[in-house]
Structures are given as C-alpha cells and as structure tokens.
Amino acid sequence: MRTTPSVSLKSVALPTEHGGWGFTLEPLLLALLLSPGPHTLGLFLLGLFGFLARHPLKLAYQDLRRGKRYPRTELALRVGGIYLGFALLGLLLTALTAKGPFLYPLALAFPLGAYMAYMDAQNRSRDLFPEIAAALFMAAFAPAGVLAGGSWANA
C-alpha cells in the first residue's frame, strides 16, 4: 500500500523569515493607531494577508515552474487563494469606507512591491535591494491608512 506523504500546513501557510513580520505589522499597526476605523482594518487585512499569501504562492510557483505537482503544491494553491481572498476583502472594505484617497501611497509604492515579488520568485528576496523595496512598499500602508481616514483634509 502506497501512501502520500503528509504536508505540514504550518510549513506552507506561514513564512519563516522573522524580519518580514516586523516590516509588515509595524506600518499596519501605525495606520490603525493614527486613524482607527473600518478603513484601516481593511488595509490591515490587505497588508497582512498579502504578506501571508506570498509564501504559499511562491512555493506553488516554484513547483509548477519545474513542471511538478507535489502534495504541497495543491495545499499551497489553496492556502494562497484563501489568503488572497481575505486580502481582496480588506481592499473592498477600505474602498467602501475610506474618506480619502488611500490608493496614492500604495500606487506609488506598487513598483517596489512588484520588484520584490519578482526577486522573490527568483529566490533573491534576501538581497539588499529587494529587502529595501519590501520595507518601503509595506511602509506605504501607514500613510494610506491616514489618507483613508480623511485626516489629510484636516491638516
């Protein structure tokens, strides 16, 4: 009888790097602190689940690029899809409740995030420039939260 090896959900669902958590959570928590409300809760979900989706989608991409489908590939696609769904719900929540132009900082930082995603797919995310790009991309969530709260109009 042949059995398929089990795959740990934790190894697929949670990224292993420690610094990424700080770069992700600090601007998101700052946005919640500076402009609490559903608009920043949505940005929190977008940023957090976008960060979480990166790891399983990278695993799935690497497997599929090699032309292989392992048990972890299917799990990674499912988990990544769920994370992306929550991220999109966060974006929708922010879009429906924002009182200001929250997309400006995110749009300006988008090329940095795209560069980081590209380098991550090439297994070069730990190089200096991708690390800096990722930190700057995530930092854009703090001003996005303030703008979403309409605080820009009160200045």
PLM feature segments, named:
Residues 40-103:
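Alpha-helical transmembrane segments and their cytosolic membrane-interface
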Residues 10-35, 134-141:
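The first (N-terminal) embedded transmembrane alpha-helix
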Residues 4-7, 54-68, 112-127:
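C-terminal ends of transmembrane helices
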Residues 16-20, 36-40, 44, 72-77, ...:
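Hydrophobic, aromatic-rich alpha-helical transmembrane segments
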Residues 88-93, 99-101, 105-145:
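Intramembrane alpha-helical segments
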Residues 1-13:
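Short, Lys/Arg-rich, polar N-terminal cytosolic tail immediately upstream
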Residues 29-44, 91-104, 140-155:
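Helix-coil boundary and interhelical linker segments in multi-pass alpha-helical membrane proteins
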